[in-house]
Amino acid sequence: MDAIADPNFQQTKLRSTATEDIPSLLTVVLDISPRLWAEFDHRSGEKQSVTTVLKSLIVFLNSHLAFNSANQVAVIAAFSQGIQYLYPRSSDTSEQNAGNSKDLSIISSHMYRRFRNVDETLIEEFYKLYQREESLIDKPVQKSTLSGAMAAALTYTNRLTKEFESISLRSRLLVITCGSSREKDEIFQYIPIMNCIFSATKLKCPIDVIKIGGNKQSTFLQQTTDATNGVYIHLESTNGIIQYLSTAMSIDPSLRQIIVRPTQGSVDFRTSCYLTGKVVAIGYICSVCLCVLSIIPPGNKCPACDSQFDERVIAKLKKKPVVPKSTLKKVKKKV
């Protein structure tokens, strides 16, 4: 029977049962761009989908804290003007906002104190930031700060890992973003995300991604989950998102080798041009810094490291292909 058993379900020896008591850090990066969520609501016919995501996220965070009394959580928001810690509350926003008390109606007064502290802080900071962002929804140029929020999350993870070095704190990162029907992979800056991949690999921190709406494929985010042993899930609707959070996204890093996770059909491993930002399959590579280019840069210099390219090599690259004379004669006869 062992010969025909699915290798995914074969028994794996665990190093120690004591790892069950090791605390875990869950860091969540939430993209709260009002323009993206408004476009998603218009296409899907949903109302206040970002609120649905927030409610499901609160349940997910509470369940993570319930697994172990020493577990930690952090939530970072990515918006058009930068990033902000929603929990733990940053020092410059430590004051309570009494005017937002109506926004806390979804929290029970009889809730466990630790849950209540996290939920109240998260909701207060979220509504203050989201209302401020709504006033900038008509701004013509809005850049994605998702890569910056991921970098901040990994920085926070590294700091806590150093503080809890004696108990080997486990960590994982969850990214929740909303897609657009007109989105392009250029909005996700390739080099910062690659830096996040290298940092997460060194920290042994899996990066999971939930993408809601938009194109099913996301080149750089899929590369991120594949390289860090994470999970990538694309959802057409926010309905039932709590089911995905409580199943696929709740797998502890220590159990990912023995639990069958959702798999991606295919991952696009293409890179992006340093100059144009476009995704390219074939391009030029600087031999010094490995910078990828889709065009020959002006001045024959690398835009990343300023290395001077060999003029003879550039001349060969710019040289047009030579068509044999015999082929030209045949073409003329046919004409």
Curated annotation (Swiss-Prot):
Entry keyword set: DNA damage, DNA repair, Metal-binding, Nucleus, Transcription, Transcription regulation, Zinc, Zinc-finger
Gene Ontology cellular component terms for the protein in this record: transcription factor TFIIH core complex; transcription factor TFIIH holo complex
Keyword Transcription regulation: yes
Cell compartments where the protein resides: Nucleus
GO molecular function: zinc ion binding
Pfam families: Tfb4
Classification via Gene3D superfamilies: von Willebrand factor, type A domain
Xref: InterPro entries: TFIIH_Tfb4/GTF2H3, vWFA_dom_sf
Single GO BP term: nucleotide-excision repair
Superkingdom: Eukaryota
DNA damage in keyword set: yes
Zn-finger segments (C4-type): 286-305
Family: Belongs to the TFB4 family.
Assembly, per entry: Component of the 7-subunit TFIIH core complex composed of XPB/SSL2, XPD/RAD3, SSL1, TFB1, TFB2, TFB4 and TFB5, which is active in NER. The core complex associates with the 3-subunit CTD-kinase module TFIIK composed of CCL1, KIN28 and TFB3 to form the 10-subunit holoenzyme (holo-TFIIH) active in transcription.
Biological role: Component of the general transcription and DNA repair factor IIH (TFIIH) core complex, which is involved in general and transcription-coupled nucleotide excision repair (NER) of damaged DNA and, when complexed to TFIIK, in RNA transcription by RNA polymerase II. In NER, TFIIH acts by opening DNA around the lesion to allow the excision of the damaged oligonucleotide and its replacement by a new DNA fragment. In transcription, TFIIH has an essential role in transcription initiation.
Record's protein name: General transcription and DNA repair factor IIH subunit TFB4
Organism: Candida glabrata (strain ATCC 2001 / BCRC 20586 / JCM 3761 / NBRC 0622 / NRRL Y-65 / CBS 138) (Yeast)
